[in-house]
Design a protein with these regions (language model features):
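N-proximal low-complexity "stem/linker" segments adjacent to membrane-targeting elements
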Residues: 1-20, 159-160
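A recurrent flexible, glycine/aromatic-enriched loop bordering the glycosyltransferase active site
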Residues: 79-83, 91-115
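A generic structural signal for short hydrophobic patches within well-formed alpha-helices
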Residues: 119-120
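Glycine-rich, basic loop-to-helix element that forms the pyrophosphate-binding segment
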Residues: 25-39
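Short amphipathic alpha-helical segments and helix-helix/interface helices
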Residues: 33-34, 61-62, 141
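Catalytic donor-sugar/metal-binding loop of nucleotide-sugar-dependent glycosyltransferases
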Residues: 110, 128-161
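Conserved donor NDP-sugar-binding/catalytic core segment of glycosyltransferases
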Residues: 37-87
C-alpha cells in the first residue's frame, strides 16, 4: 500500500509499506497519484490529510478496500465538497444518511480515502489532475461509478471520528 500524506494542496510524505519514498517536486496531489499509479500499478493508494494521520485505522485499513474497482473515503465534516446549496447533486437527496455507517456515494473526501491504482489509471486520460484534490476525487468517483466502480463513504477509515479539524 502506498500512503500519500498531504496538506490540502501539497504532498508532504509518500510511503510504501512504512518505508518513505521521495516526494515528487512540482507535482500537485492528483499528479502525484497518477505518477504513483505508473510506478506501482498493482498497489492500493491511501491518501490522508496530515491532521488525521494519527487516527488512521491501521487494524481495519486492509479489509476496507478489497477490490480493484472500489474507491472509499471519509469526511469528518457533515458537509460534502459539493454543498447542498447548489441544489440537486445526487439521487438520494431527500434521504438523511448516518455518517456512522458505510454508504454508497460518489461524493468523496480528501480527508482520508483509498483506491486501487487501477481506478486512477483507468481515468487518467478522462480526469485531468487539477489542483483542487477534493474536486479531483469527486470527478473520479462521479465518472467511475456508472462504469462499475463501487464508491463508498466509510467511517472505519479513522479510529476516532468525533473531532473536527
Amino acid at each position: 500500500m502506498i500512503q500519500v500524506i498531504h496538506t490540502n494542496h501539497t504532498v508532504i510524505k509518500i510511503a510504501k509499506d512504512n518505508q518513505s519514498l521521495a516526494v515528487f517536486k512540482n507535482l500537485n496531489i492528483p499528479e502525484t497519484i497518477y505518477k504513483l499509479t505508473e510506478l506501482y500499478p498493482t498497489e492500493l493508494i491511501l491518501w490522508c490529510h496530515t491532521d488525521w494521520v494519527p487516527f488512521i485505522n491501521h487494524e481495519q485499513i486492509n479489509a476496507i478496500c478489497t477490490s480493484n474497482s472500489e474507491i472509499v473515503s471519509y469526511s469528518i465534516s457533515e458537509e460534502n465538497y459539493l454543498s447542498k446549496n447548489i441544489g440537486f447533486v445526487e439521487q438520494s437527496i431527500f434521504i438523511k444518511f448516518s455518517k456512522k455507517v458505510k454508504i454508497a456515494t460518489w461524493q468523496m473526501s480528501s480527508v482520508i480515502g483509498m483506491a486501487h491504482a487501477d481506478v486512477f489509471s483507468a481515468l487518467k486520460t478522462t480526469v485531468k489532475p487539477v489542483n483542487d484534490f477534493d474536486y479531483f476525487l469527486n470527478s473520479i468517483a462521479k465518472i467511475a461509478m456508472p462504469l462499475g466502480v463501487f464508491c463508498y463513504s466509510n467511517p472505519n477509515l479513522l479510529i476516532e471520528r468525533n473531532a473536527e479539524i
